[in-house]
């Protein structure tokens, strides 16, 4: 599994004061699943990415930056 850098996504969550638990609930997954995804132990599904973008005000053109920046 490739590793991605989610620091920008985590920063957006902090900026909007949205916890992993709250975002997980909006997406319809457990807080554990959200944490696993943010720590590269589980892949985000397409529908999860779309809901996260909608919830955090991330444009579709921002998806590569927030979700697919490789962790070096």
Model feature map: region roles:
Residues 47-62:
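DNA major-groove recognition helix of helix-turn-helix/homeodomain DNA-binding modules
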Residues 38, 48, 67:
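DNA major-groove recognition helix of helix-turn-helix
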Residues 1-16:
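A short, Lys/Arg-rich alpha-helix, primarily the initiator
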Residues 28-44:
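Recognition helix of helix-turn-helix/homeodomain-like DNA-binding domains
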Residues 18, 44-47:
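Residue-level signal for the short linker/turn that defines the boundary of a DNA-recognition helix
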Residues 19, 30-33, 59:
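Short coil turns linking two alpha-helices in DNA-binding domains
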Residues 23-24:
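Short alpha-helical "recognition helix" segments of helix-turn-helix
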Residues 63-72:
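Short amphipathic recognition helices of helix-turn-helix/homeodomain-type DNA-binding modules
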């Amino acid at each position: 599994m490739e590793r991605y850098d989610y620091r920008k996504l985590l920063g957006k969550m902090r900026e909007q004061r949205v916890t992993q638990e709250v975002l997980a609930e909006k997406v319809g997954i457990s807080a554990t699943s959200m944490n696993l995804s943010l720590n590269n132990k589980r892949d985000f599904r397409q529908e999860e990415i779309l809901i996260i973008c909608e919830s955090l005000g991330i444009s579709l053109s921002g998806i590569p930056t927030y979700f697919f920046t490789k962790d070096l």
